[in-house]
Regions:
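A short helix-loop-beta-strand connector motif used in the catalytic cores of GNAT acetyltransferases and
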Residues: 47-56, 84
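Conserved GNAT acetyl-CoA-binding A-motif
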Residues: 104, 112-122
């Protein structure tokens, strides 16, 4: 019998486990190159942004097995706050057990608590398993695309 999964806010001691999850995620997402130090800096910044960002982790038997990040932004289209979700990752041997669903449900609750009117989610268009998963949870593709410019 597998032990219960707990969804909770990440803390600094989760850093190494979260970096490992990002390493696995970035192996799939070809737009990004894994650089553990850069990811550590990014996660540390998110952990400090307590009012406008959230990192949730899924933990089983004291092991972090999944994560999800979100940040609040102002949407002129919505006339208020929206949340953008990134970095949804579940350890490979733990997929298909509802952990991703629990993470996204908890992140939606966090966004509602912070008065968000809409959620946006970034996903790799080639990751068909993830796209199917998101669509099963009610996420819909839009006509918008994400453009990027390095500074």
């Amino acid at each position: 019998m597998t032990s219960e999964v707990v969804i909770r806010k990440a803390v600094s001691t989760d850093m190494d486990a979260m970096i490992e999850l990002l390493r696995l995620l970035f192996a799939i997402e070809t737009d990004f190159v894994f650089d553990g130090e850069r990811q550590r800096l990014g996660l540390a910044s998110l952990l400090q942004m307590k009012n406008t960002a959230c990192i949730l982790v899924a933990e089983r038997s004291r092991q972090v097995i999944g994560m999800c990040t979100a940040q609040l932004l102002v949407s002129t289209a919505e006339g208020g706050i929206k949340a953008i979700i990134e970095d949804v990752a579940v350890r490979e041997g733990c997929r298909g057990q509802g952990i991703g669903t629990q993470l996204l449900t908890a992140m939606e609750e966090w966004a509602v608590k912070h008065k968000a009117k809409r959620l946006d989610l970034l996903a790799d268009r080639r990751n068909e398993l993830a796209l199917d998963f998101y669509q099963q949870l009610g996420w819909q593709e839009t006509e918008l695309i994400c453009l990027q410019k390095k500074l």
